[in-house]
Curated annotation (Swiss-Prot):
Organism: Neisseria gonorrhoeae (strain ATCC 700825 / FA 1090)
Recorded catalytic activity of this chain's protein: dTMP + ATP = dTDP + ADP
Binding locations of ATP: G10, I11, D12, G13, A14, G15, K16, S17
Pfam families in the record: Thymidylate_kin
E.C. designation(s): 2.7.4.9
Keyword Kinase listed: yes
CDD domains: TMPK
Protein name per the record: Thymidylate kinase
Gene: tmk
Length: 206
């Protein structure tokens, strides 16, 4: 099997941070070479843009926000993702372009056609081989976000914003079931872990 590009995505409060540890443990047990990274971020340029994008004081317009996301992504692809895959290393990214379609597209209203143009220009033919989409009901997402001590620029949005974000995620997953695995993360940690491990076992033929 060629090196796999796997993404972990979902609305805020879906449990990505918790379940990244599950994925890391799965790769460690199997002794597979893997690189974990994140978006926006993963490079010095990407991390600098992340600070701007998540800062509640940032007053960026929708197009500027979207372009910053893709600028960070281009650096990420060129400096991190493609070199790792070329070296035979699997890559797991905490968020990728699905998040742009969901947040800037669904949440903010950026036309999907415009995002697709940037996607093709920045990524070429690069697409994830597998996307683990963590999903929780809107009220669960909002409750978990509400527990955060400090909310970033996106976490400060209202429920209707996250309702649209979640809708885009689920629509994209339904349109391409061969790439997406939707994981109900409104369950116990053990149940969610078992679901993720089952998906990874099936994908890698373990």
């Amino acid at each position: 099997m060629k090196p796999q590009f796997i993404t972990l995505d979902g609305i805020d409060g879906a449990g990505k941070s918790t379940n990244l540890a599950v994925i890391k443990a799965w790769f460690e047990r199997r002794g597979l070479p893997v690189l974990f990274t994140r978006e926006p971020g993963g490079t010095p340029v990407g991390e600098a843009l992340r600070e701007i994008l998540l800062n509640p004081e940032t007053k960026a317009g929708l197009r500027a926000e979207t372009l910053m996301m893709f600028a960070a992504r281009m650096q990420h692809i060129e400096e991190v993702i493609l070199p790792a895959l070329s070296d035979g290393i699997h890559v797991v990214s905490d968020r990728f372009t699905d998040a742009t379609f969901a947040y800037q597209g669904g949440g903010r209203g950026m036309p999907s056609e415009d995002i697709e143009i940037l996607e093709h220009w920045v990524q070429g033919g690069l697409r994830p081989d597998l996307t683990l989409l963590l999903d929780v009901p809107l009220e669960v997402s909002m409750a978990r976000i509400g527990q955060a001590r400090e909310k970033d620029r996106f976490e400060q949005e209202q429920a209707d914003f996250f309702m649209r974000v979640r809708g885009v995620y689920l629509d994209r997953a339904a349109a391409c079931p061969e790439r997406y695995a939707v994981i109900d993360s409104n369950r116990s940690l053990d149940e969610v872990r078992n679901s993720i491990e089952k998906v990874l076992d099936g994908h890698f033929g373990c």
